[in-house]
Amino acid sequence: MELKFNFEYRGESHFGKIYRPYARVLLKSPKQELWLNEWLIVDTGADFTTLPRYIARELDIDLKGDCMNGSTSGVGGKQVIFLLKKYLEVKLGETTRRIPVAFFDNNQVPGLMGRQGFIETFDTEFLKAHVVVFKS
């Protein structure tokens, strides 16, 4: 399998044009036969996949009952997160994985595709043509 996604142009900054590597991922609800289509930033700096709070609601995940409280630190400082107790089934193209997932306590941070159980299970390339490539 080889799957390619173009980076998304996000505007300009003092340093020039900003492009972000996004990938289309399907997320399966653990409680019903529902697949949610989401675009996640491919973030090699993220230890694990972390999603905005609203996605938990759409997947019928109860942040109090289905998750454990945790915290994470990054460029924006320390944040409260909810760690899903069970792995979540996801699809990238036709490839299915079961991955660890956490949810932010807000909707301000976009979904981040992390390394653990996901990015690290593919040969992943970031091309200078602003394309991210996943190979299995």
Where are these regions (language model features)?
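Pepsin/retropepsin-fold aspartyl endopeptidases
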Residues: M1-S136
